[in-house]
Amino acid sequence: MKLRNKLIELNIDVPDPIAPVGNYVPYKIINGFIYISGQVPVVGSITSGNIITGRVPSEVSVSEAKEAAKICIINTMSLLIEATDNTDYDKIGCISVSGFVNSGKADTSFKLW
C-alpha cells in the first residue's frame, strides 16, 4: 500500500509539502537515506502566519503543543511521500526522529506523549 493511502486509511490528511522559505532544501537523499530538514508547526504556508509559536506551558498549552507536534510530523510525512515518490510504506524504514519543544527553564511539569 502506498504511504499516502495508508495515511488516508488512518484518517490523516497530508497536505502538499510546504515550500521552503530561505536558502535550504527540505530534504536530501544520500546513499539511499533521506535526510529531512526540521519542520515547524505550520498549516498552509509559513508566510500565511498559520504557525504555532510560544513556550510550553506558559504561552502555549500542552494540548496546543501536542497539536503542534502532530503538525510537524504530518509535514515531515508530506516530504517523505515526495522524496520516496509515494512508494509502498512497508519499504520505508526510519533510523531517527528528533523533536524539540520550546519550554521554560528546566520545566519538566508536562509530557507531550
Segments the model singles out, each with a brief description of its role:
Residues 1-113:
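Short, polar/acidic, helix-capping and beta-turn segments at strand->helix junctions
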